[in-house]
From Swiss-Prot:
UniProt xrefs under Pfam families: Aldedh (PF00171)
Cofactor(s) it depends on: K(+)
Reactions catalysed, as given in the entry: betaine aldehyde + NAD(+) + H2O = glycine betaine + NADH + 2 H(+)
Name of the molecule in the record: Betaine aldehyde dehydrogenase
Family note: Belongs to the aldehyde dehydrogenase family.
PTM-bearing positions, type Cysteine sulfenic acid (-SOH): 286
CDD domains, alphabetized: ALDH_F9_TMBADH
Keyword NADP attached: yes
Gene field: betB
UniProt pathway: Amine and polyamine biosynthesis; betaine biosynthesis via choline pathway; betaine from betaine aldehyde: step 1/1
Length: 490
């Protein structure tokens, strides 16, 4: 028997057997152990979830703003009370270090839910005077039933990022977690029910993106899809959504983000920022600053500081709280990252450190790849052009501000960017020219609930978090009122 046993679908406020009974395994990437069997949804299950959501959504939307706010705040309290339990599940399912999941994943997800719970009473329309006898007022009404499709790197955090604004605005959600990391989304559904969310307002369907995800994006009963994943999948989501019922779409599709270090930067601080921008979560973060631009005159000194820091990384069992670097999410993904590393070697980049999978002792049973740093990289190399989503840093040298801005923008992505400098005039001047939706000055990676998150170019459509996202889960109804007479031309 696996550690977490058989996991059913969550529909209409309860665990429910799938129509087919087909299952797939959840695997701990630290040791290859099967930790759960998950039921795979099919078209019947999708229809059932949509029907439940359609029934529950009007009940939820009819509650007062304060009632909805109180229920979501109760969910926040339960999340925080169960933080350690959820962190342990997340670590087993993703391979992320417990030191990380315990302090970040559930904590930041709960913060987002609390933020939107507080905004619910502030969601209001406008009154617009026209003339003495007439005015217009607007209402912000929920879209109805919406779908969220998550990625595998931050399972419960992404589920909360998507569900919090949707529920706050009065919608019902059907959430499909990544088939690689599904367990905590099911726990979140339990928590919402325990907090008092009406049945059918939050449902979880597990299964593959090619099947369940496509069914959701094409379903005529769903008004909006919020998707996190890769560009190729995002294009399919947009095409399916437009080809079915012209659904509203929000997408975050990853990046190949530049981190620019200027000559006046504190080099120790710059190295620390570059480490966090490349090796946190074993490099499996969509906003990673994997293209690190360094002035040619500082390159050797910077590289020395990076190598020193990489050697201090504590790689090991993610359930050991001393570990700060765990395995990649799956063996398949490990192999993909290794192919990129091999490509970097073939194309002539200089390997400073790492560049291999870890196979000594207990690590041999897991999907571990050593933190890897390449230097003397060129802009046309595969490791510089494509999103690797792993612990691979590329160091590139430059000569001038104008040059580095041009090269930083030379990518199809536009998710994130950052600069490290003591000259704030330069910092703002450069940031304003970088084609990226999320930018950091002298820091990297933090995204507070108040901060809209999303990308330019191929990195996405729309934003998550912040006030504007709440509004995007509503539709505006305009009503004109005439208090005086009405004159017809007929």
């Amino acid at each position: 028997m696996s550690r977490y046993g058989l996991q059913k679908l969550y529909i209409n406020g309860a665990y429910t057997d799938s129509a087919s009974g087909d299952t797939f395994d959840a695997v701990n990437p630290a040791n290859g152990e099967c930790i759960a069997q998950l039921q795979a949804a099919n078209a019947q299950d999708v229809d059932k979830a949509v029907a439940a959501a359609k029934q529950g959504q009007p009940v939820w939307a009819a509650m007062t703003a304060m009632e909805r706010s109180r229920i979501l705040r109760r969910a926040v309290d339960i999340l925080r009370d169960r933080n350690d339990e959820l962190a342990a599940i997340e670590t087993a399912d993703t391979g992320k270090p417990l030191s990380e999941t315990r302090s970040v994943d559930i904590v930041t997800g709960a913060d987002v839910l609390e933020y939107y719970a507080g905004l619910i009473p502030a969601l209001e329309g406008q009154q617009i005077p026209l003339r003495g006898s007439a005015f217009v007022y607007t209402r912000r009404e929920p879209l109805g039933v919406v779908a969220g499709i998550g990625a595998w790197n931050y399972p419960i955090q992404i589920a909360l990022w998507k569900s919090a604004p949707a529920l706050a605005a009065g919608n019902a959600m059907i959430f499909k977690p990544s088939e690689v990391t599904s367990l905590t989304a099911l726990k979140l559904a339990e928590i919402y029910t325990e907090a008092g969310l009406p049945a059918g307002v939050f449902n979880v369907l597990t299964g593959s993106g090619d099947q369940v995800g496509q069914m959701l994006t094409e379903h005529p009963g769903i008004a909006k899809v919020s998707f996190t994943g890769g560009i190729a999948s995002g294009k399919k989501v947009m095409a399916n959504a437009a080809g079915s019922t012209l659904k509203d779409v929000t997408m975050e599709l990853g990046g190949k983000s530049p981190l620019i270090i200027f000559a006046d930067a504190d080099l120790d601080k710059a190295a620390d920022i570059a480490m966090m921008a490349n090796f946190y979560s074993s490099g499996q973060v969509c906003t990673n600053g994997t293209r690190v631009f360094v002035p040619q005159a500082l390159q050797a000194a910077f590289e020395q500081k990076i190598v020193e820091r990489v050697k201090r990384i504590h790689i090991g069992d993610p359930s050991d709280e001393r570990t700060n670097f765990g395995p990649l999410v799956s063996f398949q993904h490990r192999d993909s990252v290794m192919r990129y590393i091999d490509s970097g070697k073939r194309e002539g980049a200089t390997l400073l450190i790492g560049g291999y999978s870890l196979t000594e002792d207990a690590l041999a049973h897991g999907a571990y790849v050593a933190p890897t740093v390449f230097t003397h990289c060129r802009d046309d190399m595969q490791i510089v052009r494509e999103e690797i989503f792993g612990p691979v840093m590329s160091i590139l040298s430059y000569q001038s501000e104008e040059e580095v801005i041009r090269r930083a923008n030379d990518t199809e992505y536009g998710l994130a960017a950052g600069v490290v400098t003591q000259d704030l005039n330069r910092a703002h001047r450069v940031i304003h020219q970088l084609q990226a939706g999320i930018c950091w000055i002298n820091t990297w990676g933090e995204s507070a609930p108040e901060m809209p998150v999303g990308g330019y170019k191929h990195s996405g459509v729309g934003r998550e978090n912040g006030i504007s996202t709440l509004e995007h889960y509503t539709q505006i109804k305009s009503i004109q009122v005439e208090l005086g007479s009405f004159n017809s031309v007929f």
